[in-house]
Every structure is written in structure tokens, then in C-alpha cells.
Amino acid sequence: MKLLAPVLWAMAALGVTWLVAVDSKESCTKHSNGCSTPLRLPCQEYFRPACDIHDNCYHCGKTFGISREECDKAFLKDMNTLCKKLGSNSATCPARGKREVTSHRATSIAHSRLWKTALDQKSFLNRKARQVFFLLPTTCQGWAKNYHLAVKLAGANSYSVTTDLETCQGLEHCLPNH
């Protein structure tokens, strides 16, 4: 029994450390809605950690003296860091769903045929679709810039200008530079 006691203490300590790590990671989603957009866009799930930090920054930034501009700059930096993790072999964000992973080539071929068919028609809507289609980024960094631009243009109402120490207490590690 004397030999077993230190092992049990070590296991308990490791278990508590693991639970604290899981709890602190989940606490970072408390004020987050992920990378919320009305459309399903590429990199949404891949950028989720950066979006969680950004959402927390928008909710608790004022409380900890972080401006909206600092939140947005950190958001772009975090997304670019995620993009760099992909390396030079993969310029686009990895797909999350099983179907997306298994049918990557077939999907891109099917999409190109659908777009070609749709864009060959000579209507006003298709001219607009052609303009939008060619503006869409094709790289992870390109999508990071678009997400950053979107929050700069449309995120003003989401940044909390009030301090809320009660709900933000303990979330310092969920903010940029913490």
C-alpha cells in the first residue's frame, strides 16, 4: 500500500491538471459564437480558436483595457498564425467534415463545372456572380484578411463598451496577449 499511495497521488494530480486545462479551454467559449456568419465559409472551423479569442476580446476587452482595434489586430495575427501552421504544402484551410475530406477533388471539379455553366449565361445576375466569384480568396491568408475586414466593417455593434468584471473574471487567458 505504501508504494501505491504516491502513484495514486500522482494520478490524482495529473487528473486535476487535465480537468483544469479542459475547463479553462471550455471557458473561452463562454462569450463566443465561433466564427459566426450567415453563410458557410471556408476556414470557419479552422479559425475557431482565433474567433473564440476575438469574441471574448469584444465582450471583455473594455474591462481589461483592450481596444476594439487591438482585438481586431490580434484576430488577424491569430488567424495568420493558424495559416502558417499549414505550411507551404497546403495553402487552403483543411476541411472538417468527412465528406469534404474524402471528396475534395471531386467536389472542386463539380464546383468548377457548375460555376462554368452558371457563369456562361449572359444575365445581369451572372455578371454580378462572376465579379464576386473572382474576388473570393483561394488561400488561408486570403480568408484571414476577409474575416478581419468583415469584423472591421461590421463588428462595431458587437464590441462591448461597458466594463463587466463579474462575467469577465477568470477569462484573462482567453484574451489576446494573455
UniProtKB/Swiss-Prot annotation:
InterPro entries: PLA2_conodipine-like (IPR038875), PLipase_A2_dom_sf (IPR036444). It is an enzyme of class 3 (hydrolase). The keyword Cell division does not apply. Its cofactor is Ca(2+). One of its GO terms (molecular function) is phospholipase A2 activity. The keyword tRNA processing does not apply. The modification 4-hydroxyproline is found at P38, P42, P49, P137. It is found in: Secreted. GO terms for biological process: arachidonate secretion; phospholipid metabolic process. Its EC number is 3.1.1.4. Expressed by the venom duct. Catalyzes the calcium-dependent hydrolysis of the 2-acyl groups in 3-sn-phosphoglycerides. Belongs to the phospholipase A2 family. Group IX subfamily. Heterodimer of an alpha and a beta chain; probably disulfide-linked. This is Conodipine-P3. It comes from Conus purpurascens (Purple cone).
